[in-house]
Amino acid sequence: MVNYAINQFKNGLKLILDGNPCSIVNNEIVKPGKGQTFNRVKFKDLITGKTLIKTFKSGETLEGADVMELDLQYLYNDGNTWNFMDLDSFEQYTIDNATMNDAKGYLVEQDMCTVTLWNDNPISVIPPNHVILEVLNTDPGLKGDTAGTGGKPATMNTGVVVQVPLFVDIGDKVKVDTRTNEYVGRA
């Protein structure tokens, strides 16, 4: 496996840290008045999702993670597992509920998403940045209720709850940002 020196660190680089694959979120080079230069690195553990900060002296190396990111199409959910397919090779992947995390609230059949594989096992699913979902349940908007800039909660067809403007009704299709869980606009 490839080893990376501290001076090769950049955001997005995948490394093995404490036995788990991690991605560099932020790399800060610190040059104190006295002493040796060091790097303060913020990592995101790709398995647990936790963020941790470590410092490294110049000259240290870390092993690169054998991580692949594939663009897969979501096929269906059978209750316990989620099924995806690579459109190039037609290879299918089965992912359990625990690995899906928050992504399951944003995926509609036939959507494309990014699946991260480590040692040929799926470890995370990243939905597209924006998805179009249908409103299944929400309170009716009251005419003339425009005093505030507030919204109302709406349950989407995937089960996720999103704050939407007062004019959105049941059956409407809305665009949702999956990174922030915010309403973007009508679809």
From Swiss-Prot:
Q: What is its main location?
A: cytoplasm
Please state which protein family the record places this protein in.
Answer: Belongs to the elongation factor P family.
Please report the name of this protein according to its UniProt entry: Elongation factor P
A GO cellular component term found in this entry reads: cytoplasm
Q: Which UniProt keywords apply?
A: Cytoplasm, Elongation factor, Hydroxylation, Protein biosynthesis
Q: List GO BP terms, alphabetically.
A: peptide biosynthetic process
Mind listing the GO molecular function terms for this protein? translation elongation factor activity
Tell me what PTMs the record reports for this protein.
May be beta-lysylated on the epsilon-amino group of Lys-34 by the combined action of EpmA and EpmB, and then hydroxylated on the C5 position of the same residue by EpmC (if this protein is present). Lysylation is critical for the stimulatory effect of EF-P on peptide-bond formation. The lysylation moiety may extend toward the peptidyltransferase center and stabilize the terminal 3-CCA end of the tRNA. Hydroxylation of the C5 position on Lys-34 may allow additional potential stabilizing hydrogen-bond interactions with the P-tRNA.
Q: In which pathway does it act?
A: Protein biosynthesis; polypeptide chain elongation
Q: Which organism is it from?
A: Ruthia magnifica subsp. Calyptogena magnifica
Encoding gene (name): efp
| Protein function | Involved in peptide bond synthesis. Alleviates ribosome stalling that occurs when 3 or more consecutive Pro residues or the sequence PPG is present in a protein, possibly by augmenting the peptidyl transferase activity of the ribosome. Modification of Lys-34 is required for alleviation.
Q: Which Pfam families match?
A: EFP, EFP_N, Elong-fact-P_C
Entries under PROSITE patterns matching the protein: EFP (PS01275)
Q: Where in the cell is it found?
A: Cytoplasm
Q: Which residues carry this modification: N6-(3,6-diaminohexanoyl)-5-hydroxylysine?
A: 34
